[in-house]
Amino acid sequence: MMNDKDLSTWQTFRRLWPTISPYKAGLIVAAIALILNAASDTFMLSLLKPLLDDGFGNSNSSILKWMPLAVIGLMVVRGVTGFVSSYCISWVSGKVVMHIRRRLFSHMMGMPVSFFDQQSTGTLLSRITYDSEQVAASSSSALVTVVREGASIIGLFIMMFYYSWQLSLILIVIAPIVSISIRLVSKRFRNISKNMQNTMGEVTTSAEQMLKGHKEVLIFGGQKVETERFDAVSNRMRQQGMKLVSASSISDPIIQLIASFALALVLYAASFPSVMETLTAGTITVVFSAMIALMRPLKSLTNVNTQFQRGMAACQTLFSILDMEQEKDEGKLEVERAKGDIEFRHVTFYYPGKDTPALNDINIHLEAGKTVALVGRSGSGKSTIANLLTRFYDVSEGSILLDGHDLRDYRLGALRNQVALVSQNVHLFNDTVANNIAYARNEQYSRAEIEEAARMAYAMDFINKMEHGLDTVIGENGIMLSGGQRQRIAIARALLRNCPILILDEATSALDTESERAIQAALDELQKNRTSLVIAHRLSTIEKADEIVVIEDGRIVERGVHAELLVQQGVYAQLNRMQFGQ
């Protein structure tokens, strides 16, 4: 779970302001429109005095003639300013959400693999979607309410003091009480909002796990377990929502109760003869109407605090991610195409938060153009070696050299351009077959090159059977393809990149025997003149490796070629007998 920095609301808003400020022109236009909108309401109310005192009281027909035109004019102003303010605020809000999401997305892409290993996908998706929307709410809806209702309150106060300053002074007494009430509930709102955002991440994670693993849920009868899990997180979300509603609902009647006392005091004060002498029917109507009209903006300002605090809590959550250090890329060394000589020197590695090393004093030399296979039981540390070679993680002790230079001396982009990776967990994008093969480099390769890579990976036989061939959209993570077909697309991607270093992380594990034989020929061709690190589950695929390294509990326990290791009758020979049933 991420730790949110304990920033005050003001400090949080100050950090948010640089995101909003580029669009301040829209905010200024919206603010002017909102003030004019509020002013039109105030002027509409002020028309009551001349209407009652002169129009009806003194039978002044001229007032009755221009009054309808004034009402129509004010309503036109109100309608136009309402449209302008809504449009400008929506424009600013959309820009702010887009900016925050882009910044968050870009920052997450630069985070180390360890960050994603420690966070659930659902929680991160909730940060990009739900939390970003909450921030927009604090910078749009809250702003509308504060400016419009604030202008209304100021306008109503000015009008009240203009007509009867004696009665209006009573309202000044309740202002500090209202302020204290709002402050008391603000902290409560912020804490509940933080909990709601965390719970929303849990809801998203629970739903995502069920959707992605629905086949496993069905085959293992996990419907009850998943339903109970989802019910639990949904109920926590409901409870947090009810706490928020309770806090908000309590604040409303408190404000109204305070206002009712103020109205009662005004009525009492108006009964004094010295005050009554200064009042007319129009004056008392306008003052009382203004006091009642103040209830709505006061209530709105109280409610906006809920949304504003929710947005500020979301800001703190997002800032906690943006404050995390991105993947270190301090290397300066550039290389167009490496020779591919790789050496692990006394490499020890601990996963973050672990006391036991995943790898302990690993020494491996992969000569350029040679193939080294890593063999061992599940969890022995084979894939960790591949993760270190690509610098998904950095070594804890020791060093890894590429062509005599420490991997950390290379710029990350330059280093990873030297490596093609085919793993057992193939990820494909919801795009065409061709775009998946040429992923991120569509403009670099011709159609003929893409097709040739697919042919060498023995993928064209099933691609040609698709409705649109290479232009067929394969769905999210290649849902329309079988496991073997997805693996062949990944191999075609590696063939097309033509990198000097190749990592095969159980690349044929998802293939049937016939497909494996077909693709093994392509892999043999792919490995020629390339430094290959092969992590093997099927030992038959690595019998021709230049060296086989056996890993056990993060240590190298055996090394040699296939025939030598069989003669030693050690761990490799035991694994071989288990696999072939000897």
Curated annotation (Swiss-Prot):
GO cellular component annotations of the record: plasma membrane
GO BP field: transmembrane transport
EC numbers for this chain: 7.5.2.6
GO molecular function: ABC-type transporter activity; ATP binding; ATP hydrolysis activity; ATPase-coupled lipid transmembrane transporter activity
Catalysed reaction, written as an equation: ATP + H2O + lipid A-core oligosaccharideSide 1 = ADP + phosphate + lipid A-core oligosaccharideSide 2
Domain annotation ABC transporter: ranges: 342-578
Annotated binding of ATP, by residue: 376-383
Keywords, sorted A to Z: ATP-binding, Cell inner membrane, Cell membrane, Lipid transport, Membrane, Nucleotide-binding, Translocase, Transmembrane, Transmembrane helix, Transport
PROSITE patterns assigned: ABC_TM1F, ABC_TRANSPORTER_1, ABC_TRANSPORTER_2, MSBA
Pfam families the record matches: ABC_membrane, ABC_tran
Location relative to the cell: Cell inner membrane
Sequence intervals crossing the membrane: 25-45, 69-89, 137-159, 253-273, 275-295
Membrane protein topology class: Multi-pass membrane protein
InterPro entries, per database record: AAA+_ATPase, ABC1_TM_dom, ABC1_TM_sf, ABC_transporter-like_ATP-bd, ABC_transporter-like_CS, ABC_transpr_lipidA, P-loop_NTPase, Type_1_exporter
Similarity comment: family membership: Belongs to the ABC transporter superfamily. Lipid exporter (TC 3.A.1.106) family.
Function: Involved in lipopolysaccharide (LPS) biosynthesis. Translocates lipid A-core from the inner to the outer leaflet of the inner membrane. Transmembrane domains (TMD) form a pore in the inner membrane and the ATP-binding domain (NBD) is responsible for energy generation.
Domain notes: In MsbA the ATP-binding domain (NBD) and the transmembrane domain (TMD) are fused.
Assembly and binders: Homodimer.
Record protein name field: ATP-dependent lipid A-core flippase
Encoding gene per record: msbA
